[in-house]
Amino acid sequence: MLGQTGGVTVLATVDLGSSAAIIRRAEERDVPAIVDLLAADQLGATRDGVRTADDLAAYQRAFHAIDADRAHLLVVAEADAEIVATLQLSFLPGLARRGALRAQIEAVRVRGDYRGRGLGEALITWAIHESRRQGCALVQLTSDKSRQAAHRFYERLGFVATHEGMKLAL
């Protein structure tokens, strides 16, 4: 952790050329902006977003569950007093690999006007560093099959497509 800025613990700073961003732990006040990021892509547009007060309440309940559990970190990148990126990092204990602790990166989103400026790479690099710091043996992530550009991005950062994932909606 780098330090405090305005009462917020800064986890990392990112030089964006003409400006800078900080990576910090998400706070409840960030939930609407995070949901906007989730809903702003082709997949999230059909499953995320706040249309009613009940929708917002569901996201707030989820935020509180994540925030209360030390095995989960929800972080945001803030630039020019706006939330411009997010990701969730979860730590998963398991018996496989001699009881190795794994890190799972999920819900990576960077606002469109901040893509291509190094912010996504900085977020992932921070997540890898934090995973090492927590004693993880590996970092894993999933990405929808339709996200070919994201796959190339993750491969460029050293991730290897080793598994075929499956989901069952409940």
Where does each model-flagged region fall?
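Conserved beta-strand in the GNAT
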Residues: 74-76, 82-91, 109
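A short beta-loop-alpha structural element at the N-terminal edge
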Residues: 22-36
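Conserved beta-strand-loop-alpha-helix junction that forms the acyl-donor binding cleft
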Residues: 140-150, 167-169
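A short helix-loop-beta-strand connector motif used in the catalytic cores of GNAT acetyltransferases and
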Residues: 64-75, 104
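A conserved beta-turn-beta hairpin within the catalytic core of GNAT-like acetyltransferases
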Residues: 94-105, 115, 161-162
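Conserved acetyl-CoA-binding loop-helix of GNAT-fold acetyltransferases
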Residues: 107-110, 116-129, 152, 156
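Conserved GNAT acetyl-CoA-binding A-motif
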Residues: 124, 131-143
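Conserved GNAT-fold acetyl-CoA-binding loop/helix
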Residues: 28, 39-62
